[in-house]
From Swiss-Prot:
Sections of the chain in a coiled coil: none
Entry function: Endonuclease that specifically degrades the RNA of RNA-DNA hybrids.
The family this protein is said to belong to: Belongs to the RNase HII family.
Gene Ontology molecular functions: manganese ion binding; RNA binding; RNA-DNA hybrid ribonuclease activity
Pfam families: RNase_HII
Residues the record lists as binding a divalent metal cation: 17-18, 113
UniProt cross-references to PROSITE patterns, sorted A to Z: RNASE_H_2
Cofactor requirements of the protein: Mn(2+); Mg(2+)
The name this protein goes by in its record: Ribonuclease HII
UniProt xrefs under SUPFAM superfamilies: Ribonuclease H-like (SSF53098)
E.C. code: 3.1.26.4
UniProt keyword terms in alphabetical order: Cytoplasm, Endonuclease, Hydrolase, Manganese, Metal-binding, Nuclease
Length: 199
């Protein structure tokens, strides 16, 4: 984790991040996390960083620690149907907004991972490029969102066997693409994402 000193923490600051933006299947998830400095230090010592850099075992171990140490956390999601209807950027913003609105108190500042502002949020915000590697609050949000989405996709894999969802979590792996060609999409696939693949 780098440049922590330049990014605020505290009871009035929420970090927000999304997961599943590039998937072919299922919803896009977001999480919002409020962390005080002492909790951030504990989490960083426990190995907190960008969820993409963590093993599944490490991420799973961090979830209860984040939940016990944070001031507040919340999840939001936008469905594949919403993604098809309004596009991935708007759907991602909706998921982030839903997470922020589920916090017990509206944050005075939102740290948004990436370089695109959250257009639906009307309070103060700051975009943070590579935020999940620079802000403990954003990193914690990335872990919670990733674990929650992966758990949902594992449950859905039982409803839709044959697509390997439990292995690739809905991302466009070669196996997933071949399953789509062989069997066609499910109702929970993002049909607008499949036009090039399936014609």
């Amino acid at each position: 984790m780098t440049a922590q000193e330049s990014l605020p923490l505290g009871r009035d600051v929420a970090g927000v991040d999304e997961v599943g933006r590039g998937c072919l299947f299922g919803p896009v998830f977001a999480a919002a996390v409020v962390l005080e400095g002492s909790a951030a230090e504990c989490l960083l010592k426990a190995g907190l960083t960008d969820s993409k850099k963590l093993s599944a075992k490490r991420r799973a171990a961090l979830v209860p620690l984040i939940q016990s140490l944070c001031v507040a956390s919340a999840l939001g999601q936008a469905s594949a149907r919403e993604i098809d209807a309004c596009g991935i950027r708007v759907a991602t913003e909706r998921a982030m907004l839903r997470a922020l609105q589920r916090l017990p108190q509206s944050p005075g500042l939102v740290l948004v991972d990436g370089n695109l502002p959250l257009r639906l949020w009307h309070g103060p915000q700051r975009t943070v490029i590579a935020g999940d590697s620079r802000s403990a609050a954003i990193a914690a949000a990335s872990v919670l969102a990733k674990e929650a989405r992966d758990a949902l996709i594992r449950r859905l894999s039982a409803r839709f066997p044959g697509y390997g969802l439990e292995r690739h979590a809905g991302y466009g792996t070669a196996q997933h693409r071949q399953s789509l060609i062989d069997s066609g999409p499910t109702p929970l696939h993002r049909h607008t994402f499949l036009k090039r693949l399936l014609g």
